Amino acid sequence: MSRIGKRPITIPAKVQVAINGTNIVVKGPKGELSRTLRDNVSLSQEGEILHVNRRDETRTSKQLHGLSRTLVANMVEGVSQGFQRRLEIQGVGYRAQLQGRNLVLNMGYSHQVQIEPPDGIQFAVEGTTNVIVSGYDKEIVGNTAAKIRAVRPPEPYKGKGIRYAGEVVRRKAGKTGKGGKK
């Protein structure tokens, strides 16, 4: 029995939900999201409460029950509050800046790396070393933040690179010398 799938989803006042079979459209102040769920689950709405139900007790239905509920809950939260992901840049000379909507990264390469935001995504830069990726679709926010981090992932010896805020980088010991030249 999926404990996550059994939890009801509360719909905020400014959010409208339209259910058409396995299709769901969620509209809110931040934007509009739609998704087609699998046939193994069904949606039912009672006032401001949304329930995700299984159609049968097969193993696949049980697996998709909690997943579908979480996806719908993320849609509701995204269009009402939105999501954001913070990234930190560490390293001498590494910095970020905005050019229009695009994010420009100086990461020690011979060229600047320009990242164009997908639809519904905004970049913000605090100082020159903190980047905030925000939007209403949790999946796209996470994928965009992962693309930015992939430009220069943190290396294990000095920890230089782009990391998520609060990420702990596993450090390695460097080479130990023999005691000098002879």
Curated annotation (Swiss-Prot):
GO terms classed as biological process: cytoplasmic translation
Would the keyword Membrane turn up in this protein's UniProt record?
no
Sorted keywords for this record are: Ribonucleoprotein, Ribosomal protein, RNA-binding, rRNA-binding
Output the Gene Ontology cellular-component terms.
cytosolic large ribosomal subunit
- NCBIfam families named among the record's database cross-references: L6_bact
Q: Molecular function terms in GO for this entry?
A: rRNA binding; structural constituent of ribosome
Described purpose of this protein according to its UniProt entry: This protein binds to the 23S rRNA, and is important in its secondary structure. It is located near the subunit interface in the base of the L7/L12 stalk, and near the tRNA binding site of the peptidyltransferase center.
Q: Which Gene3D superfamilies match?
A: Ribosomal protein L6, alpha-beta domain (3.90.930.12)
**What family does this belong to?**
Belongs to the universal ribosomal protein uL6 family.
Q: What is this protein called?
A: Large ribosomal subunit protein uL6
Highest taxon listed in the record's lineage: Bacteria
Question: Mind telling me which Pfam families this protein's record contains?
Answer: Ribosomal_L6
Q: How does it assemble?
A: Part of the 50S ribosomal subunit.
Known HAMAP family for this protein?
Ribosomal_uL6_B
